Amino acid sequence: AAPIQYFFRQNATATRLVSIDIGGGTTDVAFAKDGDLQHVTSFKFASNDLFESSLDASLRNGIIDYFKKIVENKIKDIDELKKILDSNTKPSNIASFFFSLQENPAASDLDKSVINFDSLLREDEHFKIVFIIFYTAIIYHIAQILLLMGMPMPRHISFSGNGSKVLRVITSDSKLLAKFTCKIFQLLGVEAVDGKLEILGLGVDDSSPKQATCKGAL
């Protein structure tokens, strides 16, 4: 619930807020109204599920297998980065390495546009649907909780946690994502008080997802 406090401090207009903290193994959700925490829940469906299955120990993943060849070619002349990549075998660990690559000091001389994993995924039409389904599944689950609790559509949804970085693959436009989210709520019959929804935590000017989690605890 730490991100709840942070976003209420940063957003004076926040009234009905759902905080979604996506980690590697779990997604933690908190429902709040006017700064008061009303309900919390957690479920084992998070970013790692995009890159590996909890049902088997397979080291194969279509997304990672495809992009590993591309990234390997970009960093082939940087031993430090090659060693890190070669030392990771789990697809989820490789994905974390890819997402952090452009911020790695060892990659400072590389063109950021060619090692930006967010952009590579966003521009790829084959795998984007996987991330859209991932996001839709989370929002669907939250909609079911709202219906069960008799709660209306939130005015704001805030995202935090390193796992929420994958949502930027869908779009970098928070307003577009908000429209898509509203449509899901509407289709499932969630009451809309004013029909307005704002997505927080994913914009370029917002704090990083991990920072939002940490700052809320301060």
Regions found by a protein language model. Name each.
Residues G35-K69:
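Short glycine-rich, Thr/Ser-proximal phosphate-binding strand/loop in the N-terminal lobe
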Residues Q5-T13, F31, H39, I64, ...:
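Helical "lid/coupling" subdomains associated with nucleotide-phosphate turnover
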Residues L17-D21:
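Short glycine-aspartate micro-motif
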Residues G24-D28, A46:
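Short acidic, Gly/Ser-rich segments with clustered Asp/Glu that frequently serve as metal-coordination loops
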Residues G24-G25, D34, S164-K165:
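Short, glycine-/Ser/Thr-/acidic-enriched flexible segments
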